[in-house]
Amino acid sequence: MPTLLAPLNKLSSDVRRAALLNIPVTARTISVVLTRTRDIDMTVRRLVYGSVLLTHAELPDDAMPGAAHPRALTIAQREQIVRHGLGDREPAVRAAAGKLIGAWVDAVSVGTKKGAVFEDLLAFLGTFDLRESAVVEDALLSVFVTRVDVFDALEFDGAHLSS
């Protein structure tokens, strides 16, 4: 495995991009992939969020979650993705991270019934440490910006407000 991951540490950003696109994202490789969220090259950082993690975050029907599915990541890894992605200096990287975080809402979706958006957002928030984390607010705001459909579908009634 070390030989397979070695190109991710090469000086050439082209080599790192090619390695990211061809490396299998597994529980053993995800931590190395996440180190590229702090790459010096903006294109590599954008690729991590917009291609590698996004592709492996979606859950095919009746399949086990991939290594980049929000439930497969640790809380620390999810928080790292949010912090580094939404805090990046480049707007293109922030946009790619926002798209990934928006996709997480669908990835952890609990149902398809009418009005399930609130429950889906609760499931999304449940993937974070709500007591200790400061990035949850950023993640939720990002969902509201990138997923206008989610924001527009939110309805608060007395049952939600009384609990």
Task: Give the positions of each predicted feature.
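N-terminal alpha-helical segment
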Residues: T29-I30, R78
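Alpha-solenoid helical repeat scaffolds
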Residues: M1-R28, S51, A67-R71
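Long internal repeat-built scaffold domains in very large eukaryotic proteins
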Residues: D62-S163
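Short coil/turn segments at helix-helix junctions and helix-capping linkers
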Residues: T3-R17, V32-L47, I81-A95, T127-R131
